[in-house]
Amino acid sequence: MLTTNMAFLIGTLLLNAPGLVNDEVHCLTENIYYEARAEPLDGLYAVAEVTYNRVHSPVFKKDTACGVIYQPYQFAWTRSKYPIREPAMWERSQKVALSYYYFGKWVKPVVPEALFFHSGKPLGYHSRLTYLKQIGGHKFYSL
């Protein structure tokens, strides 16, 4: 299994390879950037992991990262996209997205059962979920 640090190094190498950024990698990069760009590296991988946990969950009924990310009312940033104001954080997010997309099954899980997360004040439905752990400013939950 790869640690998140090792996976990030792979992402750094992949960033320079032509043709690897497809729609799925782009959607995953956006989700990581808008949801967790200032979080520790494990937090970025946790957002990627939650995204793909949703892809593989029958609850969300979508089979792509773009599908689960753009499902209505799942991620607040999708309702009003903001410009990329921190290029270094975008690049960091893209390295995580690339490494997770191409090598995710070999990355040691950070939040293996998580389907939900939040930062700040929890919403009402969080009380019905099972709390798993906190990474940086995010709390992660399963059903």
For the regions a language model picked out, list residue spans one by one.
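Sec-dependent signal peptide recognition
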Residues: M1-G11
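Bacterial extracytoplasmic/cell-wall-associated proteins, especially those involved in peptidoglycan
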Residues: I10, L14-L143
